[in-house]
Curated annotation (Swiss-Prot):
Pfam families: MMR_HSR1. GTP binds at residues 30-37, 57-61, 75-78, 142-145, 174-176. GO terms for molecular function: GTP binding; metal ion binding. PROSITE patterns: G_ENGB. Mg(2+) binds at S37, T59. This is Probable GTP-binding protein EngB.
Length: 197
């Protein structure tokens, strides 16, 4: 699949603001600073489609991007940033849960993990949450250019052993810097789009 067109549509905090055109949605979620914005920019070949925030935990909105005039990438707010208040954490939880709960258009969730670190409790909770809502999930280990191949192999095993992915949930690797893993990722996304189209 080639992404030829990518357009920001809306930032939403409430379900009433979500697009109503019934197009397929693929959501991206992960810890603050896991490289979510950079990954979406790399997939779409657009350097500034998604603003890369210098302040972790700043994004509190759900951003919808129309891809190839056919489906949406949905950028969910990052989680796990220690310096936000309990009230902010609660509001983050509500925004994300409102979206995940019964969103028919959502056909796949991409859970991003920094390949250099063991999944955190927040990552484990998020994966369990996605399974609770019965979403098929693609786990993507980001920043793979920052580790050696042997270290990556070890770290992927740690990710598998920690999250214990359900059958059908794939683990992919990705580098926004050198685009490693991009073709494979796009192929997987294409199969999702084809399946539901």
């Amino acid at each position: 699949m080639e992404i030829k067109q990518a357009e920001f549509i809306i930032s939403a905090v409430h379900p009433s603001q979500y697009p109503k055109d019934k197009r397929i949605e693929i959501a991206f979620v992960g810890r603050s600073n896991v490289g979510k914005s950079s990954l979406i920019n790399a997939l779409t070949n657009r350097k500034k489609l998604v603003k890369v925030s210098g302040t972790p935990g700043k994004t509190r909105l759900i951003n919808f991007f129309l891809i190839n005039n056919e489906f949406y990438f949905v950028d969910l707010p990052g989680y796990g940033y220690a310096k936000i208040s309990k009230t902010e954490k609660k509001s983050w939880g509500k925004v994300v849960e409102d979206y995940l709960r019964g969103r028919e258009e959502l056909k796949r969730v991409i859970l991003l993990l920094d390949c250099r670190h063991k999944p955190t409790n927040d990552d484990i909770t998020m994966y369990k949450w996605l399974k609770y809502y019965n979403y098929n999930t693609i786990i993507v280990a980001t920043k793979v250019d920052k580790v050696s191949k042997s270290q990556l192999f070890k770290n992927l095993k740690i990710i598998k052993d920690t999250l214990k992915p359900e059958t059908g949930d794939e683990i992919l690797t990705f580098s926004s810097l050198n685009k490693q893993g991009k073709e494979e990722f796009l192929k997987v996304l294409e199969s999702v789009i084809d399946f539901y189209s």
